[in-house]
């Protein structure tokens, strides 16, 4: 087992990529503590993990709030005693509009859920990790941080900011036993966020949803979407000792779009 006896705090883990990461980490021996905004999905996911013989716990949290970030970390420590791995995965796309029409309140919300929450949660776990000279932080960024797509300025800015945070935190933690990396997923069309976004984009483009998706996927070298399980496998690699020489990296899992 690649994560035996490790404790992982995984945000945005009631469904989609976070849920897939939680299941795989539990299968590989980690105790997983999950957060999301809704109780029902968390209860379902932790129940599945427990029935499979894994260890899990959860707390609902709105990670745009500093108080909820602190409460999530405290709840994970209360449940399992420590945090060895932090996966910042919570996500919110925001309005699909051009920059000139993007409401500031929505921009601030997207930045808060992605970048600000990743900063706050990292800040809350780093002292513990430094004291042990051991720990891993993984930030789930996006292809949008590297490729240019219209109508998503808040999301792109937040995800690009996460890459900067990744590099700085990696530089600070490298001699203290802490590794920090990021994943930039491409389109994971099975997630609700991707489905909702596709519907909005199709309407703006004057095509149906299947046509919009086919056109987008045609721009990928592999010509297909990624799966949540593929992102989870990359997350497992980056959070295990198999990637012990890697820190400060942003790993593209995008089917062949970004090459840096």
Question: What are the functions of these language-model segments?
Answer:
Residues 174, 179, 246-248:
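Short, small/polar-rich loop/turn modules that mediate ligand/substrate recognition or access, typified
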Residues 127, 171-172, 244:
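Alpha-helical segment proximal to the catalytic Tyr-Lys
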Residues 122, 158, 166:
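Active-site helix of classical SDR
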Residues 7, 12-16:
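Conserved glycine-rich cofactor-binding loop
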């Amino acid at each position: 087992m690649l994560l035996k006896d490790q404790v992982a705090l995984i945000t945005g883990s009631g469904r989609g990529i976070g849920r897939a990461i939680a299941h795989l980490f539990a299968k590989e021996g980690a105790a997983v503590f999950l957060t999301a905004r809704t109780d029902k999905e968390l209860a379902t996911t932790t129940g599945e993990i427990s029935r499979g013989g894994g260890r899990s716990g959860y707390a609902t949290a709105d990670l745009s709030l500093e108080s909820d970030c602190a409460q999530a970390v405290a709840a994970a420590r209360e449940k399992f005693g420590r945090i060895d791995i932090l996966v910042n995965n919570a996500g919110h796309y925001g309005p699909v509009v051009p920059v000139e029409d993007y409401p500031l309140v929505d921009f601030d919300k997207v930045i808060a859920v992605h970048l600000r929450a990743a900063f706050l949660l990292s800040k809350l776990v780093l002292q513990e990790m430094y004291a042990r000279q051991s720990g891993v932080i993984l930030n789930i960024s996006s292809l949008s941080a590297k490729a240019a797509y219209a109508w998503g300025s808040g999301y792109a800015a937040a995800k690009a900011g996460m890459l900067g945070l990744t590099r700085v935190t990696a530089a600070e933690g490298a001699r203290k036993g802490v590794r920090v990396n990021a994943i930039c997923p491409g389109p994971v069309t099975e997630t609700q966020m991707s489905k909702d976004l596709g519907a909005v984009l199709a309407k703006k483009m004057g095509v149906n949803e299947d046509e919009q998706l086919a056109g987008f996927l045609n721009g990928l070298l592999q010509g297909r979407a990624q799966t949540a399980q593929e992102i989870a496998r990359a997350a497992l690699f980056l959070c295990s000792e198999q990637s012990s020489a890697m820190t400060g990296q942003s790993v593209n899992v995008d089917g062949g779009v970004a090459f840096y």
